[in-house]
Amino acid sequence: MKKLKNSELNRISIEEFKNSSKTPIKVLLDNIRSAHNVGSIFRSCDAFLIDEIILCGITAKPPNKEIRKTALGSTDSVKWSYFENIKDAILKLKQEKYQIISVEQADKSTDLKNFKIQSKKKYAIIFGNEINGVNQKVIDMSDDVVEIPQFGTKHSFNVSVCVGIVVWDFFTKIKTN
């Protein structure tokens, strides 16, 4: 077994990415404080052909040198938009028949491994602020809340790690559904 070089990975071009069939997921980032986290999230969304990232509130927007450091060019491939208020984004997505899923620790949350993907559904997955998480009013607007089980002493993941875990899980469930 040998490690592959970047030139051997057969990655698609940015143009091919833009023209390819996307995973029916929109990732919403609400008031994410760290531009480095935003850049890392762009990379994860590129990796799984996510349809769009919707940046909300104080979340940094491209072009931004701090995003660029961790995004490694993925802001050029992944479609993104901005809403000042996440509630407006949610209302628009509901009109477009998206299932609104918040990722948060909540009393009636669904364990991520038990969340069932429905074929032909489109998903909008909301990730909240690094300190306060997803706002309760946003949870109230959601169709479901999923939670990543945790077993250590800390009560949260870094938001970019959380996005990677959840998006990979949804991606694999959609592709095998």
Placement of each model-derived feature along the sequence:
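Post-transcriptional modification and biogenesis factors for structured RNAs
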Residues: 1-177
